[in-house]
């Protein structure tokens, strides 16, 4: 599996295209937030089993808004969104972001 950094709308398109084949996780986080640092550890541990597409909010704020709009989820940070077939199946923020929870939701929708 992989960890991919998104910067552009084309990167988001590629992530949503990838979700047509198998569920993915979109991970949005801040480079300066302690909650983001904890969530990033959980997501990093899951990267061996899940394709993850991440953005750093300080560098991709507009892309974060597009993700919220296109997936019809409220913006949060940090936030992990499980996506399958271009649709959000679930989204988690702050302390809700747990490696096992992400793996279980992805496996249930594979």
PLM features: residue spans?
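Thiol-based oxidoreductase modules, predominantly thioredoxin-like and allied folds used
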Residues: 6, 28, 50-66
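Short cysteine/histidine-rich metal-coordination sites, predominantly Zn2+-binding motifs
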Residues: 47-53, 101-103
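Non-catalytic, surface beta->alpha helical segment in thiol-disulfide oxidoreductase systems
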Residues: 82-110
């Amino acid at each position: 599996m992989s960890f991919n950094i998104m910067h552009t709308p084309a990167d988001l398109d590629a992530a949503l295209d990838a979700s047509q084949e198998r569920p993915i996780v979109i991970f949005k986080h801040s480079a300066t937030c302690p909650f983001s640092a904890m969530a990033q550890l959980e997501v990093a541990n899951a990267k061996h089993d899940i394709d993850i597409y991440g953005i750093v909010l300080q560098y991709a704020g507009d892309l974060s808004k597009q993700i919220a709009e296109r997936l019809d989820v409220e913006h949060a940070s940090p936030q992990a969104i499980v996506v399958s077939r271009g649709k959000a199946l679930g989204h988690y923020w702050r302390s809700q972001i747990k490696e096992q929870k992400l793996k279980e939701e992805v496996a249930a929708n594979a």
